[in-house]
């Protein structure tokens, strides 16, 4: 009797661990897949911490981000359906066996404040991440040890279909979000976000004090300057960095500062208080920016001039790169300087386009989906693209679930029906013998 009870308890425990791991891996893989560039930036942060950034090829962090998202998502689905139980549970144990001590080191040394395990969707402290990984490691060891107790949701006749569709789905999702923009934007600059409100500090809270330093060059000599002592135009911009002088309450948007390249003037308030539309061309590094749509970008600038809208290019590039971009593209729009990390956070495209009004993000486009003359047929006030679509998020949720859940449900139903008729046929054959 006791052995039967123990057998039942182990089965319940194993499947509970299986569903927990499946949920975490599916969610973790999905949020990485919808923001592959964000995962790439986090991997680059790790490489810099370990001192490997200079020795790693530029393409490798992005490749690693794509593979990480696909592996986590696929393992989660395979656990959920009980596919290739031995191999799947082995990979899960190996991953957790590596990540748990790594996050312990992160918690102790704190070189990075957020491990990035759930992208920008859920932010955990390093100690919270370590605690989560200890729990998942226990669950992983359990499903590996008692993998034969995992109840498959599909038979071996159809599990390859589920496995293949899962791989194709997450591959397509990753590539789409890389070419366009993340399907779900968990960052503070999402469509509909009020940048002013994101910068607000609750009453009674002490704000974090930041200092932006600009590295400029003249006659071969580099010097650091602040906004208070920014020099004249005879100095050439090289780089900028934002540092914390005094830690305090940190709002979701804490380093949004637009500095006009021409004279070093801070025009942040001017941009955020503008009750007209403002185009922001965001290119964190012009030397790496995609210049395949330069004609369309110039047409967008001409459109903004024609209808009286402001147009700025925000970048963290040095003056030499800005001049090179102007020569190559014929750009006539004004350039402004901004923190590199902020630019990467604003939009996952280099370059990308953001439309503001009264400091609210109205719309965003990647370099591959910029509005053209066939869309910009009139003033923005009369066009749908200049209105916030309130239904966007809910529609995306339904669409994403429909493309993933419904096909898997269909495969499962076909499998059940097939198995039912197969057993019925076999039973009938046995009766006739």
Task: Name each model feature, range by range.
Residues 172-266:
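Membrane-interface segments at or immediately adjacent to transmembrane helices
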Residues 311-312, 329-348:
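Short, internal strand/loop/helix patches
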Residues 88, 289-295, 393, 397, ...:
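Juxtamembrane interface at the cytosolic side of transmembrane helices
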Residues 11-33, 61-102, 138:
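Functionalized membrane-embedded alpha-helices
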